[in-house]
């Protein structure tokens, strides 16, 4: 982990901590912390312009800082496994990720789109998967979606073919799941 006044400076400092230069084509997951989430555009643009970046590099947000994430070493393999599972249409038929080349970086305006959020329990240092999605306009976050709202967003944007809803009606738990949904 490293910090800098620019992306290039932070990456240079991170490279100095290693015994060899990182090869970005090996990376499938880009984690952006709370500082980067205020305006993700420069980070996504940097890696989209990086010739060595993998074409399917998927970006995720995390509420943890680099220091907090480094304290959760036990769950890093879970994060990588979940990220790899979510890249592309998963078994739940929901495509929660986009590669950095699919994300709409509209000129100088910045990111217009969404990024999934990896959830963690800081106290228990436990990884909890993707439970939220942040919507961005001109690079800045403007809405956080969870549960049914997140699923509906994916469905309406052609990124899901099923919908699972769990709710309460008059004190009773109601659950339903639809499959093979197709918008026409």
What is each model feature region?
Residues 1-184:
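Membrane-proximal alpha-helical signals and transmembrane carboxylates
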């Amino acid at each position: 982990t490293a910090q800098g006044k620019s992306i290039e400076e932070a990456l240079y400092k991170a490279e100095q901590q290693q015994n060899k230069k990182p090869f970005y084509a090996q990376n499938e997951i880009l984690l952006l912390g709370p500082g980067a989430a205020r305006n993700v555009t420069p980070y996504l643009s940097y890696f989209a312009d990086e010739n060595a970046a993998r074409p399917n590099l998927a970006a995720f947000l995390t509420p943890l800082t680099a220091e907090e994430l480094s304290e959760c070493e036990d769950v890093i393999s879970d994060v990588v496994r979940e990220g790899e599972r979510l890249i592309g249409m998963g078994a739940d038929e929901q495509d929660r990720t986009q590669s950095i080349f699919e994300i709409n970086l509209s000129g100088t305006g910045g990111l217009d789109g969404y990024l999934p959020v990896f959830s963690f329990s800081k106290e228990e240092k436990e990884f909890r998967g993707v439970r939220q999605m942040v919507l961005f306009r001109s690079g800045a976050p403007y809405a956080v979606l969870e549960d049914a709202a997140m699923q509906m967003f994916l469905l309406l944007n052609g990124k899901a073919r099923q919908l699972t809803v769990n709710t309460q009606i008059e004190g009773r738990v109601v659950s339903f799941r639809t499959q093979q949904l197709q918008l026409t």
